[in-house]
Amino acid sequence: SDPIPAMYDYMQITVYDGSFTPAFVVAVDVAGIQLFGDHNNIQDYAEHVDLCIDHHGSNSGYAYETLVDDHAAAAAELLTELIPQMGVELTPEIAACLYTGVATDTGCFRFTNTTANTHLAAAKLIEAGADVEKLNERLFECRSHARIQAEKMALESLEFYYEDRCALICLTWI
């Protein structure tokens, strides 16, 4: 599995270390078992998922129970509704994590999957304490050194064709 990017280090993420057998397995925003990754034998549980909460219409239905709403812009949008229904308070920490999911899946509310319900979910998360200014800056304005270097390489290779109607960028990875 890929490491968790540093831009998400404000979240309290615990990576499964394989030291226990989960009693209940919930997959969120995972449309198929092939997307589980390979970290610490997580594939051992991929075929034993009790519940999947997802917003992808392409969800393969691999879990014993599946909640899929392909009208939702993000699984985090669904969780914003579900968590209070389970009697759990939307704390500022939870709200920040869910806002991150909604904002990233919608391109900061610019993509066509963004609906009025998406904005209502974001409003609930803001009311619960998500620091939108800080989160949006971190998610969409800050760039890692590696990303800046990649952008530099891309721009250095930029060429225009057909009276500047077509632009070509070439990036190679070693």
Residue ranges and their predicted role:
Residues 30-33, 56-58, 173-174:
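Short glycine-rich anion-binding loops that position phosphate/pyrophosphate groups of nucleotides
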Residues 1-7, 21-22, 104-174:
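Hydrophobic helix-and-loop "lid/oligomerization" segment in the mid-to-C-terminal part
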Residues 45-59:
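Acidic-glycine-rich active-site phosphate/pyrophosphate-binding loop
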Residues 20-22, 46-47, 63, 163:
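Residue-level preference for short coil/turn positions at secondary-structure junctions
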Residues 37-39, 62-64, 113-114, 135-137:
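A short secondary-structure junction signal
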Residues 1-45:
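N-terminal small/polar loop signature for handling phosphorylated ligands or for N-terminal nucleophile
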